[in-house]
């Protein structure tokens, strides 16, 4: 079929398999060009490995460190009627390219929150790898099915205490609007912590530990975002922030647990990037368009792959083998360049000046749109989007259920 982009709200409902593979190839090429990561882990499990930072983590481990990787994700394959999810095509492309490079790669598709996912992963590790040296936790899901009761819990992208009103961009109409978001209820806050906090990360590590598949010196890392006062009301000071604080709590508990085997647990605070997750957060697209422009001008802009390569090579697995620098909460900070005073001051000054008329001139809004559509495999140079493509790609993926 011939596949064109169809945007609805903040998601693109179609995906292009050839474009998704091109994205994965681009990240692999970047990683290889940087050179091998010294002291890299050799057996890596990535929970949430099909897009964004999770996918980049799998690429860094495999193509930067030569690691055997197992990826866990929840994605839909294509059928003869419609394309699959971008994550499915990303994961399929990764597997194919890893195998071509002579690397071990196996993937589990299903609900990563489930007990079954953990058991399947453990069986696979025992069967093929013995143990794991690094566990990356990179799940971004709006819903969690509780593993023991089957109850569905939903997260809320809402402020706490009062209605939040701010300038934002309507990405469908490309106009500046005033966006208002009602505050979260106590129940919504608790639910957001349940879905996006650290509990499932702890359950993964506990299951792996009890099964004896965590190697001596095993590290684990989970990803977070803190941002700045421009986004704090909706993010760090909102329901989502409570969940991210719970991730910090989990990291502290896991760090104590893993210390016995010479291991560590850290939250890595990453920069804002264009992902399906961030596009759903009011205010984020406009903030990203602003901060990207300034960071590009300063030569410090990074996408997912650049961030994760830097995290592996300059934080978790430093060349001299020394412990990584951390902040007061034992977090690895990779948002250091984004949070530079000159960059943030620029955004603060610019924010009130943005109008529909000057949006494209004062920010990297067009670049934001390009990166967004690229997530789904569109707008990539060298791909013929009028050509017939097969939405059903070959992928020897293991179904969890």
From Swiss-Prot:
The protein's GO terms of the molecular function aspect are: enoyl-[acyl-carrier-protein] reductase (NADH) activity; NAD binding; trans-2-enoyl-CoA reductase (NADH) activity
Q: Which organism is it from?
A: Vibrio cholerae serotype O1 (strain ATCC 39315 / El Tor Inaba N16961)
- Root EC class: oxidoreductase
- Catalytic activity line of the entry: a 2,3-saturated acyl-[ACP] + NAD(+) = a (2E)-enoyl-[ACP] + NADH + H(+); a 2,3-saturated acyl-CoA + NAD(+) = a (2E)-enoyl-CoA + NADH + H(+); (2E)-butenoyl-[ACP] + NADH + H(+) = butanoyl-[ACP] + NAD(+); butanoyl-CoA + NAD(+) = (2E)-butenoyl-CoA + NADH + H(+)
Describe the subunit structure.
Answer: Monomer.
Which sites bind substrate? 225
Binding residue positions for NAD(+)? 48-53, 74-75, 111-112, 139-140, 244, 273-275
Q: Where is the active site?
A: 235
Site described as Plays an important role in discriminating NADH against NADPH, located at 75
> Which residue pairs form cystines in this protein?
none
Control of this protein's activity is summarized as: Weakly inhibited by triclosan.
Which keywords does this Swiss-Prot/TrEMBL entry list? Fatty acid biosynthesis, Fatty acid metabolism, Lipid biosynthesis, Lipid metabolism, NAD, Oxidoreductase
The role this protein plays is: Involved in the final reduction of the elongation cycle of fatty acid synthesis (FAS II). Catalyzes the NADH-dependent reduction of a carbon-carbon double bond in an enoyl moiety that is covalently linked to an acyl carrier protein (ACP). It can use both crotonyl-CoA and crotonyl-ACP.
Q: In which pathway does it act?
A: Lipid metabolism; fatty acid biosynthesis
Q: Which family does it belong to?
A: Belongs to the TER reductase family.
Question: Gene3D superfamilies, per this entry?
Answer: NAD(P)-binding Rossmann-like Domain
Please give the name of this protein. Enoyl-[acyl-carrier-protein] reductase [NADH] 1
Q: Which PANTHER family match?
A: ENOYL-[ACYL-CARRIER-PROTEIN] REDUCTASE [NADH]
**Gene Ontology annotations of biological process type:** fatty acid biosynthetic process
The EC number(s) attached to this protein equal 1.3.1.9, 1.3.1.44
Does the record bear Coiled coil in its keywords? no
């Amino acid at each position: 079929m011939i596949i064109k982009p169809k945007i609805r709200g903040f998601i693109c409902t179609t995906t292009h398999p050839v474009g998704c593979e091109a994205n994965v190839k681009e990240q692999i090429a970047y990683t290889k060009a940087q050179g091998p990561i010294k002291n890299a882990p050799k057996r890596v499990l990535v929970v949430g490995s099909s897009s964004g930072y999770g996918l980049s983590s799998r690429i860094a481990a495999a193509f930067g460190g030569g690691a055997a990787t197992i990826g866990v994700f929840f994605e839909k394959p294509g059928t003869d009627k419609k394309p699959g999810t971008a994550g499915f095509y990303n994961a399929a492309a990764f597997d194919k390219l890893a195998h071509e490079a002579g690397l071990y790669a196996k993937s589990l598709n299903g609900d990563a929150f489930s007990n079954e996912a953990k058991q399947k992963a453990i069986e696979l590790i025992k069967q093929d790898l013995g143990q794991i040296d690094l566990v990356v936790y990179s799940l971004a899901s709006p819903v969690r099915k509780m593993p023991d009761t089957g109850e569905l819990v939903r997260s809320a992208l809402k402020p706490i205490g009062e209605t939040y009103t701010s300038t934002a961009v309507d990405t469908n109409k490309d106009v500046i609007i005033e966006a208002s978001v009602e505050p979260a209820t106590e129940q919504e806050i608790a639910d957001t912590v349940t879905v996006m906090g650290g509990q499932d990360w702890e359950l993964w590590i506990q299951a792996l530990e009890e099964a004896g598949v965590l190697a001596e010196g095993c590290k684990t890392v989970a990803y977070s975002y803190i941002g700045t006062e421009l986004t704090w009301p909706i993010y760090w000071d909102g329901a989502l922030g409570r969940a991210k604080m719970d991730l910090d709590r989990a990291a502290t508990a896991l760090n104590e647990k893993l210390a016995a085997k010479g291991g560590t647990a850290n939250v890595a605070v990453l920069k804002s990037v264009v992902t399906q997750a961030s596009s759903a957060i009011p205010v984020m697209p406009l903030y990203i368009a602003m901060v990207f422009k300034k960071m590009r001008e300063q030569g410090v802009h990074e996408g997912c792959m650049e961030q994760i390569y830097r995290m592996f090579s300059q934080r978790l697995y430093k060349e001299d083998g020394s412990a990584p620098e951390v902040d007061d909460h034992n977090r690895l900070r990779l948002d250091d360049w984004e949070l530079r005073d000159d960059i943030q001051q620029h955004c603060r000054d610019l924010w009130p000046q943005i109008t529909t008329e000057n949006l494209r001139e004062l920010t990297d809004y067009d670049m934001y749109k390009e990166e967004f559509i690229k997530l789904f495999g569109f707008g990539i140079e060298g791909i013929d989007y009028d050509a017939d493509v097969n939405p059903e790609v070959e992928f020897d993926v293991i179904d969890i259920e």
